[in-house]
């Protein structure tokens, strides 16, 4: 059974693509028709491909690895940050820094610098420096937080990327591909689907469409993590029961 309903996709406008004259011919298999100069996405295919993508993301989440959410366009920023935080995943919703993946060691240095300034605010260091120095450090931290705050806890490269608008996030796509990191993405009719490992043909401009898909990804991760915890608890209980049985047998 699909995790989506056709009606909810229609209400969210998932089926509305771009102007036909701006299309990418490689998206032809996922286009249902052209109406008033606009391509209409085949939602039957979206249903199937979205389920495939979510199943694969579920498998990754169960390993405990991280999935990075990426979406820096205006319509996606708040959705990306809110849903990624709910799922406990790293995210980028402001500017993508070149080398965020391919030069991760340098990015980690910037994150450590950000965390260092944060500690200065609480350990009394700020009381020992001038007002001007404090102001400069606060501004530096705010700048770093704006760009790197979503990946502040990330200690290694993500296991996968989930992207909204691969055309806008082309640098992130290029970096992930060069490192062999699987890419899951909402792909509109003006984008090249061959750049993505798991395509979700969908309107990547409408807020409701973005919300529907990003929420589904976050829900999948949250549910997968909760299931993993439940399985670990049950496994622990089974081990305890087994030890108790062995103890009783030894006592006899």
UniProtKB/Swiss-Prot annotation:
Molecular function GO terms recorded: structural constituent of ribosome
Entry annotated with the keyword Zinc: no
Biological processes annotated in GO: translation
HAMAP family: Ribosomal_uS2_B
PANTHER family membership: 30S RIBOSOMAL PROTEIN S2 PROKARYOTIC AND ORGANELLAR (PTHR12534), SMALL RIBOSOMAL SUBUNIT PROTEIN US2M (PTHR12534:SF0)
Record NCBIfam families: rpsB_bact
Protein name, UniProt field: Small ribosomal subunit protein uS2
Organism: Chlorobium phaeobacteroides (strain DSM 266 / SMG 266 / 2430)
Gene name in the database record: rpsB
């Amino acid at each position: 059974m699909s995790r989506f309903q056709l009606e909810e996709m229609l209400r969210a406008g998932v089926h509305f693509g771009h102007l036909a004259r701006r299309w990418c011919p490689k998206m032809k298999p996922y286009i249902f028709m052209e109406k008033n100069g606009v391509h209409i996405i085949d939602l039957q295919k979206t249903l199937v491909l979205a389920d495939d993508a979510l199943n694969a993301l579920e498998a990754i989440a169960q390993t405990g690895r991280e999935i990075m959410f990426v979406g820096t366009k205006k319509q996606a920023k708040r959705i990306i940050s809110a849903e990624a935080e709910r799922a406990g995943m790293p995210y980028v919703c402001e500017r993508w820094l070149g080398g965020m993946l391919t030069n991760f060691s340098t990015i980690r240095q910037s994150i450590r610098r950000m965390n260092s300034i944060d500690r200065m605010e609480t350990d009394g260091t700020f009381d020992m420096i001038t007002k001007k120095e404090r102001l400069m450090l606060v501004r530096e931290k705010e700048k770093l937080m704006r760009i790197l705050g979503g990946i502040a806890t990330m200690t290694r490269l993500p296991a996968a990327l989930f992207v909204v608008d691969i055309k806008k996030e082309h640098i992130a796509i290029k970096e992930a591909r060069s490192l062999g990191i699987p890419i899951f993405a909402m792909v509109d009719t003006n984008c090249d689907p061959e750049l993505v490992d798991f395509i979700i043909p969908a309107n990547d401009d409408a807020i409701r469409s973005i919300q529907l898909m990003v929420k589904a990804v976050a829900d999948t991760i949250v549910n997968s993590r909760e299931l993993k915890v439940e399985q670990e608890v049950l496994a622990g209980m089974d081990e305890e029961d087994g030890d108790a049985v062995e103890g009783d047998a030894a006592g006899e």
